[in-house]
């Protein structure tokens, strides 16, 4: 598997997870997320296990549905066991409980509510930092407009007898 980040999320938060994936990939961070990256006919559990083991960074889209999802809990537990860097991206005010509280209590969060897109820049910068990539400038949410073409230099005129 060839990815940097595993994105864990509840299917009820799929639009947010897809947006996070898109933004990270626009910045050159290779992402893995189910079901997008699960080959047809493959066993979900086996492929997800392999993807978490192979990732360098684990992004958890944390919400009430995620806190109740057995899949998300299992993915988080495996990431913790494998000593992955975990970045929780909180999209609502759901409190931590149970095993999630034990795992995430000492982790710095990206608090992205009520507007889940408001902290995409912070997430991109954190991912680049943890992946050891140099900062390439400020995070942009709008396309960069290229500068206009430079004005050509005036043509040089030669006189008879000039050496060039």
Language-model regions, residue ranges each:
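Tryptophan-anchored aromatic micro-motifs
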Residues: 156-164
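Short, hinge-like loop/turn segments at secondary-structure boundaries
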Residues: 49-52, 103-108
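SF2 helicase/translocase ATPase core recognition
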Residues: 90-91
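Glycine-rich, charge-decorated loop segments at or immediately adjacent to ligand/cofactor-binding or catalytic sites
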Residues: 94-106
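Conserved N-terminal substructure of TIR/SEFIR domains
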Residues: 1-61, 65, 70, 80-85, ...
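Short acidic-hydrophobic, aromatic-tinged amphipathic segments that line or gate anion-handling sites
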Residues: 109-115
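Proline-centered loop/turn at the N-terminus of a beta-strand
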Residues: 85-87, 108
């Amino acid at each position: 598997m060839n990815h940097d980040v595993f994105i864990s999320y509840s299917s009820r938060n799929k639009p947010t997870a897809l947006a996070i994936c898109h933004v990270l990939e626009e910045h050159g961070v290779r992402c893995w997320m189910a079901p997008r990256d699960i080959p047809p006919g493959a066993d979900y559990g086996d492929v997800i296990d392999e993807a978490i083991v192979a990732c360098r960074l684990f992004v958890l889209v944390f919400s009430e549905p995620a806190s109740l999802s057995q899949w998300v809990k299992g993915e988080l537990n495996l990431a913790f066991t494998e000593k992955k860097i975990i970045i929780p991206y909180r999209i609502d005010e759901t409190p931590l409980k149970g095993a999630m509280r034990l795992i995430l209590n000492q982790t710095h969060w990206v608090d992205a509510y009520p507007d889940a897109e408001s902290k995409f820049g912070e997430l991109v910068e954190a991912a680049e930092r943890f992946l050891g990539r140099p900062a390439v400038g400020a995070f942009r949410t709008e396309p960069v407009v290229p500068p206009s073409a430079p004005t050509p230099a005036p043509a040089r005129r030669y006189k008879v007898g000039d050496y060039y």
